């Protein structure tokens, strides 16, 4: 589930044209002509090496296999790591990755027996065994290891034990029945125990002990040193400090520019025919380009092989060029991602409680000009949504209706909640703790080619009813650091999921707020938590769907998010790979399967 600039000569002249527009028309024509000449004379890339270049709008915070968890990290991890189970991009279903087959579920529906593929080897030549898998699972719950999201996801695991008769087998036992227990295995990235924990310190503790946060009180110097080493920033960025089972390894990370992966020599899976094990390119470069103008120029120069992150205007502009169409497949593919505005329902001390009142949150949803946003920002290439489960997902409720834009109702709700303009400055205000407070909140967002325009459109809409928005643009990692720390008034974010049944615990359970998880806004109470727990323990799909529908209705009624739209992916894929098969599931393509020998 889940899960999401630079200047150059071209951009410089575009900005200069805007300035010169206010002076003389000949000057404008001169600059435009020079810009056109610059574009028409771009030097194309030479395809003399077996390299695939993939575009990213931002770089990940890190590539730590446990502690980092964002869309860009997972995209690169597809090439460098192996999970016990992984998502089949074509079918949207789980399939074995490091396991030889799907886990065997025992009759009690609580025990899952797993057997690893034989013959998998680490970079030092050592064979992968169940000891590595058990260490990998323990690391996800160990106090002091910085994987807060994983701790809530693995809260249902009671034990993990090796098979004394088979060095490749182990059994997970769950505390209680859970609708998607097997899906937990898709979160387990295999770690080499000898590399990460050479003294086998976690081997001294069973799973139950490690799942207890108080165990840290008994940790000695050795354990503290292990935690510091495990969490060290070098383990997320420095090539020789990283280890993985995938067909590629980190060669170079040029911060803010590119991440270069190199194909491993004599990799254990070279003979595999599975799509996730293909390693056709010698190198895969993940190149960071944050703005559309430089990206457009890079595509004209054929410096990018694949991007799923074109804006709608950029795609339409490129598709109007015959040279681009001759070199690239391009189009739109659906996704399981949505954009939202989250409102802080539990602000920290000292922060104005703008959104603790449900009427205010509903007013915010009624003000949001969703149809205009879709028309202007996405050029009609997105879909309005009513909640966090999207069409095509298992528990989608087709009867849940989207809220309609209604400024008059919004104004009435704001007035009823005490927000009125008492001083005639066109901004509503309210007496809070004896002080007049203007409705002037900060909206944090991740800087990207489209969010600036989107935020300005939103800002104008809310100002029309007496609410001031103060935009706060942040880089990718800073944005999510702020979100996890709950240090925001409102945030413009996005979640990505899959066809797999949704576990609402990660985003909507109150524990995921208190323990630093992904419930950024502080949604939830005892009743909604109980519904989430009931849905997660219900093995009957029809009964579970009813519970999930009720959870969706509560979320819509409480309005912690203003749901904006289900995004589509605007992509370009170089034709030298011979086909344009893209999948709805992220990252939409198996990078190692791209065959650069096809001309």
Language-model features: where?
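Long beta-strand-rich cores associated with HINT superfamily self-processing modules
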Residues: 571-599
């Amino acid at each position: 589930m889940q899960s999401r600039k630079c200047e150059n000569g071209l951009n410089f002249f575009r900005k200069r044209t805007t300035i010169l527009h206010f002076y003389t028309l000949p000057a404008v024509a001169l600059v435009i002509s020079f810009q056109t000449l610059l574009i028409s004379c771009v030097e194309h890339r030479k395809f003399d090496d077996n390299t695939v270049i993939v575009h990213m709008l931002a770089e990940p915070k890190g590539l730590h296999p446990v502690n980092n968890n964002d869309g860009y990290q997972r995209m690169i991890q597809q090439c460098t790591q192996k999970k016990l189970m992984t998502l089949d991009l074509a079918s949207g279903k789980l399939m074995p990755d490091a396991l030889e087959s799907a886990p065997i579920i025992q009759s009690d529906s609580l025990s899952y027996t797993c057997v690893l593929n034989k013959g998998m080897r680490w970079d030092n030549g050592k064979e992968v065994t169940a000891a590595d898998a058990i260490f990998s699972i323990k690391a996800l719950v160990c106090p002091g290891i910085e994987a807060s999201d994983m701790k809530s996801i693995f809260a249902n695991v009671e034990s993990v034990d090796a098979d004394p008769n088979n060095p490749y087998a182990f059994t997970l036992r769950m505390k209680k029945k859970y609708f998607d227990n097997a899906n937990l295995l898709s979160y387990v990235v295999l770690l080499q125990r000898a590399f990460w924990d050479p003294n086998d310190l976690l081997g001294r503790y069973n799973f139950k002990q490690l799942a207890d946060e108080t165990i840290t009180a008994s940790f000695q110097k050795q354990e503290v040193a292990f935690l510091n080493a495990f969490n060290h920033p070098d383990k997320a960025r420095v090539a020789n400090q990283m280890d993985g089972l995938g067909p590629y390894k980190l060669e170079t990370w040029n911060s803010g520019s590119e991440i270069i992966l190199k194909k491993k020599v004599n990799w254990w899976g070279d003979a595999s025919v599975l799509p996730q094990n293909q390693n056709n390119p010698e190198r895969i470069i993940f190149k960071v380009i944050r703005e559309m103008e430089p990206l457009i120029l890079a595509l004209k120069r054929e410096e990018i092989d694949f991007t799923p992150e074109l804006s709608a205007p950029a795609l339409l502009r490129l598709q109007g060029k015959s040279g681009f169409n001759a070199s690239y497949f391009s189009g739109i593919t659906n996704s399981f991602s949505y954009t939202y505005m989250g409102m802080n329902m539990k602000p920290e001390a000292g922060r104005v409680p703008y959104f603790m009142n449900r009427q205010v949150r509903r007013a915010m949803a009624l003000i949001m000009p969703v149809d205009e946003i879709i028309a202007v920002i996405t050029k009609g290439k997105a879909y309005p949504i009513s909640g966090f489960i999207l069409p095509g997902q298992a528990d989608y409720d087709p009867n849940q209706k989207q809220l309609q834009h209604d400024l008059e109702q919004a104004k009435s709700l704001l007035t009823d909640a005490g927000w009125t303009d008492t001083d005639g400055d066109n901004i509503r205000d309210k007496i809070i703790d004896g002080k007049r407070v203007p409705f002037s909140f900060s909206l944090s967002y991740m800087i990207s080619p489209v969010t600036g325009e989107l935020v300005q459109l939103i800002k104008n809409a809310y100002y029309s009813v007496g609410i001031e928005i103060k935009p706060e643009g942040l880089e990718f990692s800073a944005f999510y650091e702020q979100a996890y720390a709950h240090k925001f008034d409102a945030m413009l974010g996005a979640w990505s999921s899959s066809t797999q049944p949704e576990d609402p615990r990660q985003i909507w359970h109150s524990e995921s707020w208190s323990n630093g998880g992904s419930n950024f806004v502080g949604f939830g109470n005892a009743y909604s938590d109980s519904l989430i727990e009931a849905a997660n323990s219900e093995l009957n799909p029809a009964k579970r769907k009813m519970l999930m529908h009720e959870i969706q209705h509560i979320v819509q009624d409480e309005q912690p998010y203003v749901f904006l739209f289900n995004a589509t992916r605007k992509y370009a894929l170089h034709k030298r790979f011979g086909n344009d098969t893209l999948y709805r599931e992220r990252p939409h393509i198996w990078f190692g399967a791209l065959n650069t020998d096809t001309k």
